[in-house]
Amino acid sequence: MKRYSIIRSFCVLVTLSWCMISCDGFLKESPRDALPEEEGYRNITELYLNAVASLYNYIGGNSDSQGLQGTGRGIYDLNTFTTDEAIMPTRGGDWYDGGFWQGLFLHKWGINNDAIQATWEYLYKVVMLSNKSLEQIESYALTHADAELPAYRAEVRALRAMYYYYLTDLFGSIPLVLSSKVASKDIVLSERENIFNFIFKELQETAPLLPAQFSNRSGNYYGRLTRPVAYFLLAKLALNAEIYMDNNWVDDIHPNGKTIFFDVDGNTFNAWQTVEFYCDQITALGYRLESDYAANFAVYNEGSVENIFTIPMNKTLYTNQMQYLFRSRHYNHAKALGLSGENGSSATIEALQTFGYETNEQDPRFD
C-alpha cells in the first residue's frame, strides 16, 4: 500500500511537471504575420521603408484630429477658427456641437477640450516615432556604412523638427523630447525660445543633406520633406521669430525682428533678412507664384510651381481625406453640383474686408 502511494505520487508529480512544461510552450505565441523588429532593418531598403517612409503615413489623416491638414478638429481648425480668418456659425441646429466651434472663435476652450488634447497626442506621437526611427538608423549605422544614411537621418530629423514647429506654434512652451526611451517623470517643459532655437538649428543642419527636389510632383519625392520644404519652414520661423522667441506674453517687453540675429550661411542676418534669404533660396530652386492662383487648388496640381509641400490625396492610393471643401458648401449648392455639403465654415467679414470686399478696391477674384 505504501509502495503504491509512492508510485502514484510520483506519477502525479511527473504529470503536473509535463503539464507545466506543455502550458509554458503553449503560451509562447508565434504568429505567422508577425516580424521580429530587428528583421525589419536588415538592409538599407528595409531601413528606409520602416524608419523613414513609414513616418509619412501620419502626414495626412482620415479621422478627427489626425494629419497635418485635411481632417476636422485638428491643426487646421485650431489655427483657423481661433482667428478672424473664418468662423463656423451655428445655423439652426447645425454646427453648435456643444459650443465647440463658438468656444474656438471666442477663445473659451477649456482644459477638457477633446480636440486640443487629441491634436497634442497626434503631434507627439509622430515626434516619438521619429525619435524611434533615429535610434534605429543609429543602430543600423553601427554595422553598416551605406551612402544613404546621412540623407535618411537628415530627413527624419527635419520631419521631427516640422512637428515640433506645429507643436510650439499651437502650444507655445512644450516638452522637448529627443528619445523614445525617456521616462514620463523625466519630461520637463522647455521655454518657447529654446524650442524655436532647436527647430531652427535642426532645419539649418539638415537642409543641405536633403534632396533639392519638388515635393509636390509625382515621383520618388512626392509628399516628402525635401530641401525646399526645409527652407520654407526656416522662412516661416524667421517671419514669426518675434512671437516664437517671446517667453512672456504678458509683459510689455517683446523681441524685435530687427534685433533678432541668425547665423545664415556664414552671414549674420536679422529676422527679416533671414526671411528674404530663405525665400530667395526657394526661388532659386524653381518656385514662383502661379499666374492663376486657383491653379494651386486644381485636382491635378502636381505641376504647380507655387505649392511647396502637399499631402497626397489620391483616393486609390491613400486614405488621406480633404474635408474642408464639402464642409463649406451650402446644401443647395452641393446638391446642384451633385456633391456633398455641410453648410459649415465661412469667411469672416473682417477677412473679406482685407481684400477690399464691397469697396472700389475689391479683389477681382470676388467677381
Q: Model-derived features: where do they sit?
A:
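A general, composition-driven signal for non-globular sequence regions
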Residues: 2, 151-154, 321
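Bacterial N-terminal signal peptides that target proteins for export
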Residues: 2-11
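Hydrophobic helical h-region of N-terminal Sec-dependent signal peptides
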Residues: 12-16
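C-terminal motif of bacterial Sec signal peptides marking the signal peptidase cleavage site
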Residues: 20-22
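An aromatic- and glycine-enriched ligand-binding surface/loop that stacks and positions planar moieties
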Residues: 24-101, 174, 209, 224-367
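Short linear capping/connector segments at secondary-structure termini
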Residues: 33-36, 178-184
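Conserved, well-structured interaction surfaces
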Residues: 45-68, 89-171, 183-219
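Short, small-residue-rich loop/turn micro-motifs
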Residues: 172, 178-180, 203, 241-243
